[in-house]
Amino acid sequence: LCRDRFGEKPLFFLKESNELYFGSEIKFIRCLLDKKLNIDLKKLENFLKFGYKYIHKNNKSYYKNIYSVPSGSFLKITNNNIEEFKYWKIKSEIIDIDEKTYFQDLREKLFASIKLRLRSDFPIAFHLSGGIDSNSLAFIAKKYFNYNLKTFSIIGTDPKYDESKMINFASKQLGADHTNLSIDVKKINFLNILKKQIKYHDSPVTTINSLLNYTLYKKIKKDGFKVSITGIGSDEIFSGYYDHHLLYLNEIKDMKNLYEQSCANWGRIVNPVVRNPFLKKMKLYINNPMFRKHIYQFDNFKKDLFLNDKSPNFIE
């Protein structure tokens, strides 16, 4: 039983007596069993304690005895024995090349990736925000591959998060056929959306963004698109979170010149736009290296965690 290299396609399995059940959805396994599944309360408890960054620490599902096959792996099943083998993993190595070459390699790989994803039998929609990630993808598709852009954006009512000015500017510069979807969060029944998403995924919803994106995807589908491209994931690749900057400062604290220069850049460029009061502290990880231990240390975590009301660890 084999899963693709990156785990793009879900694959779950259940071994019961002399039978093996597997499928891309847990609800499919439930239909084959024709009986009720039991929720793994420990898995659910850990999700509530540690958040979505915990859920991929192991291959357990939210149902007892149902597991996912890890990405790039296959299972060998013989009688009552299940063996797991890793057939592929990312190879990484540090290559000493100059900065210009790094940028050129990155540019070539990004362009090749976009070109590959534009190769589709169906028209493709683009998500467009006020940020650099989605704008870069749309710009490359338009300028370098002459793609006829159809873009979609969510526009909220809270002025603190209103990116409509940048979105409208970008869509005009791109010459895109653009649609703004205005959302008033006070008028949306998020509980109904939440129930639907939990039913679809057979698991809790990880972030609030998925609730908003659900309404955007409905609009995209209504307009005749089956495929869309977003800038989601760029922050993980290019250290786009403030935590990454603070962890970096902690790593270079003994390199005096670089540390002082980086601290000056942080204070001048980054700090003014940080809203989280904890992440505004430049020496956060220097003074408290275990600040985010709930993300990467969980086996011996305190069981009375919920008693620590308003813990800074859970300010995201």
What are the residue ranges of the model-derived segments?
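Cysteine-centered catalytic environments shared across enzyme families
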Residues: 1-201, 213
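Glycine-rich active-site loop/lid subdomains used to bind and stabilize high-energy intermediates
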Residues: 79, 172-316
